[in-house]
Swiss-Prot record:
Belongs to the radical SAM superfamily. RlmN family. Its main location: cytoplasm. This is Probable dual-specificity RNA methyltransferase RlmN. HAMAP family: RNA_methyltr_RlmN (MF_01849). The gene is rlmN. InterPro entries: Aldolase_TIM, Methyltransferase_A, RlmN_N, RNA_MTrfase_RlmN, rRNA_lsu_MTrfase_RlmN/Cfr, rSAM. It comes from Alkaliphilus metalliredigens (strain QYMF). GO terms for molecular function: 4 iron, 4 sulfur cluster binding; metal ion binding; rRNA (adenine(2503)-C2-)-methyltransferase activity; rRNA binding; tRNA (adenine(37)-C2)-methyltransferase activity; tRNA binding.
């Protein structure tokens, strides 16, 4: 039986654990504070008794990711991390530096099962879900490495957060806790390819985070070409789930739209997208895709991206073009991990 990971526990769960072993609630609070500061050795919990430390070390564990590799963009200072997990798997995270502070883009799964054709994260399929502690530790390691506090989080790394629903919700509760990283919900963005039932469940929880929907097409026929999830849920169902979400959380929804040359970047698609989103409290984030070796899709021309944006704006839809960051270090989701895994496999074959 796996030991309980202290870094994956909410404050409430930590208190329940400590009550079960005959300890006071305030001891649970102390332990919660320690693990969310990034300590990895039980002996570092200096305000806990030696007896309790011994018991915890025997009956529990603390997630301990490691920075395997780090790449710093010479263009904009973006930092790309490869994290080594306890079981040897690799995940990636990105630290982006803005005037308003540091934003961490973290992974929620090892690989991804969603199969989106323009995303490198999914080329090897899903290997496993991450625990909440493995998500938290990505942030802790980035903070320790940079010596700076991270003020914003985006769940846009490898994996589909709502496909790992329970651990993602646990992560949100932990990271928002005043005794932990204390990052406000309004500084957290969750990106999903559109798991309709889970969007409704998330909305019902009334956690006021920012929701981003990976839409990438204005109609079902086009969306099915690049996103397998569209075979399961129609765009009408997805948009309705967004209206349902807004009933519980009056937070503007972002629709991510990756522009692919001669696929979804035409004037027709821009007008169709405008009609689809009319009246919805939303914003469109236009994303010039990064070319992926395993795929044949090409990035839209800058002039076409701007024309697409202008059409949306003229139709009353707020739209921005996402700033490209870390392009010289394979900063796009999944690219660096895929290259690392491929290189390791080639190395193993050459050593046989």
């Amino acid at each position: 039986m796996d030991k309980v990971d202290l870094l994956s526990l909410t404050m409430e769960e930590m208190e329940s654990l400590f009550l079960e072993i005959g300890e006071k609630k305030f001891r649970a609070k102390q332990a919660f504070q320690w693990v969310n500061k990034g300590i990895k050795q039980y002996e570092e919990m200096t305000n806990l008794s030696k007896k309790l430390i011994k018991q915890l070390s025997e009956e529990t564990r603390i997630t301990h990711n490691r920075i395997e590799e780090k790449f710093v963009s010479k263009i904009d200072g973006t930092v790309k991390y490869l994290f080594l997990l306890d079981d040897g798997h690799i995940i990636e995270g990105v630290l982006m530096k803005y005037k308003h502070g540091f934003t961490a883009c973290i992974s929620t799964q090892v690989g991804c099962a969603m199969g989106c054709q323009f995303c490198a994260s999914t080329t090897g399929g899903l290997i496993r879900n991450l625990r909440a502690g493995e998500m938290i530790d990505q942030i802790l390691l980035m903070q320790q490495d940079q010596g700076e506090r991270i003020s914003n989080i985006v769940l846009m790394g490898s994996g589909e957060p709502l496909h790992n629903y329970d651990e993602t919700i646990r992560f949100l509760k932990i990271v928002n806790d005043p005794e932990g990283l204390n990052i406000g919900n309004r500084h957290i963005t969750l990106s999903t390819c559109g798991l309709v039932p889970e969007i409704k469940k998330l909305g019902a929880l009334q956690i006021p985070i920012n929701l981003a929907i990976s839409l990438h097409a204005p109609n079902d026929q086009l969306r099915k070409q690049t996103m397998p999830i569209a075979q399961k849920y129609t765009i009408d169902q997805l948009i309705q789930s967004c209206y349902d979400y807004l009933e519980n959380n009056n937070r503007r929804i972002t629709f991510e739209y990756a522009l692919i040359e001669d696929v979804n970047d035409g004037e027709k698609e821009a007008h169709e997208l405008s009609k689809l989103l009319k009246g919805l409290l939303c914003h469109v984030n236009l994303i010039p895709i990064n070319p992926i070796e395993e795929r044949t899709y090409q990035k839209s021309k800058d002039s076409q991206v701007k024309k697409f944006q202008q059409i949306l704006k003229s139709n009353g839809i707020e739209a921005t073009i996402r700033r490209e960051m870390g392009t010289d270090i394979q900063g796009a989701c999944g690219q660096l991990r895929r290259k690392y895994v491929d290189d390791q496999e080639k190395k193993e074959i050459s050593e046989v």
